[in-house]
C-alpha cells in the first residue's frame, strides 16, 4: 500500500510539472 501511495504521489507531481510547462509554453506562444 505504501509503495502504491508514493507512486501515485510522484505521478501527481510529474503531472503538475507537465501542466506548468504546458502553460508556460502557451504563454510564450501568446
Swiss-Prot record:
It catalyses: carbamoyl phosphate + L-ornithine = L-citrulline + phosphate + H(+). Keywords: Amino-acid biosynthesis, Arginine biosynthesis, Cytoplasm, Transferase. Its EC number is 2.1.3.3. Signal peptide: none annotated. It is an enzyme of class 2 (transferase). It is found in: Cytoplasm. Pathway: Amino-acid biosynthesis; L-arginine biosynthesis; L-arginine from L-ornithine and carbamoyl phosphate: step 1/3. Belongs to the aspartate/ornithine carbamoyltransferase superfamily. OTCase family. This is Ornithine carbamoyltransferase. It comes from Staphylococcus epidermidis. The gene is argF.
